[in-house]
Amino acid sequence: MLNRNFNLLWLSQIVSSIGNKLTIFGFPLVGIFIYDTTVLETSMITVMSFLPSLLFGTIIGVVVDRGDKRKIGIFTNIICFVISIILFVFSIFKILPLWGFYILIFLLNTFLLFGSISFYSQIPMVVEKENLKKANYKMELSNSVIDTAAPSVGGIIFGLFSAPFIFIIDGITFILASFCQILLPCDIEKYKVKTKKKSIVHIREAYNYVFNNQILFKLAMSYFVLVFGIGIFQSIQFYYLSKVLNVAPYTIGLIISVGNIGLVVASISSLKISDTIGMERTIILSFILYAVGFTLYYLSSEESTLSLFVATMCIGAAMPLYNVNATTIRQSNVDLSMLGSVSAIWRIFGRGLIPLGATIGGGISTYFSVEIAILISVIIVLLGLCIVLFSDELKKYT
């Protein structure tokens, strides 16, 4: 059974995710409508959001493994609250230059990285291995509801007030998340890493741990390729909708929210699908849905709102199907003493590749076209699919 400690962690994730999803929606809109950013400048917002994973992921993983994960989560939420309020004040009064906006995005996501790695490192400590898939299922289900509602709420806030007001809500959720984590017992962490090894030695051991475990290695390679393609797509998605297809901000929110019905349906059914066809085949299905969704975006025009709904449904459905199963496989193959470092490696070469994808996506869109960038993202996702299809190690999870 899932216990009180998991429920408190889960609740902290729910409230912080509400603000985070609104902020993810609001960042590009603030850039486009407050700073009048170009496609390359807009893609830089994605770069600044994910660059901390690439630069600091490894050392943050070591800090989390050796530190008190509960305290790390509490303090990072408080710091993120302060940054969110600064973002609101500076953006609403338009006294922050674009480069300053980028810096605050970078700082916010740096501290979010501490919180995220510490959070996911605590889950296997409070949940038995046989219940990990159920725990991941519950978290993906709540995330899907938030992902579905957040864009519409963000669009309404933008229409009634302005995008910077989203940062106020984000700040409030950070405080609430801290309160949930304060309620956790101080001795929740029973597996602290007590070692005199230098950080560089710990980091090297973590990389060897991943690359010598063929299940983790193949899972990692497919994930890294997938998020590279997602990075290209995400960096230009809002620009493509608002500037190329001339979709209004409110309609963008509606498209993403209504389209995210696929996210909710897949989240609800992900456990059943996984139990029926196996975790490996469910991961394959998620890659196919990503490729179909990106392709439909590529084929869309100003009049094809329906295809944008369907495309977003496919992309939304892919996310929980992948996350529940891939995360469960990873967690079940990692020693508790290496949770933070291995999670950080996933961040570095996973989310850390999104800035590279975003930069390339912005460059391709600038020098060629946004449509070409989307097409390239489809091809890259299909390459990730091939890694899973031809992996004998992952077939044990069919």
For the regions a protein language model found, what residue spans apply to each?
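Helix-loop junctions on the cytosolic side of multi-pass membrane transporters
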Residues: S121, M125, F167-K197, L389-T398
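C-terminal transmembrane bundle of multi-pass solute transporters/carriers
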Residues: L55-T58, R66, R70-I72, T76, ...
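Hydrophobic alpha-helix/TM-entry signal in multi-pass membrane transporters
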Residues: N5-Q13, G73, F101, S144, ...
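Helix-loop boundary and gating motifs at the non-cytosolic
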Residues: M1-P52, N208, N212-G259
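Transmembrane alpha-helix termini and helix-breaking/packing motifs in multi-pass membrane transporters
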Residues: P28-I34, F88-F93, A149-I169, K243-V244, ...
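Cytoplasmic helix-loop-helix junction between adjacent transmembrane helices
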Residues: I105-D147, P151
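Hydrophobic core of transmembrane alpha-helices in multi-pass small-molecule transporters
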Residues: I14, P97-F114, V225, T305-L321
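Loop-to-transmembrane helix entry/capping segments in MFS-fold secondary transporters
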Residues: V39-L40, K129-M139, P249-Y250, L336-I345
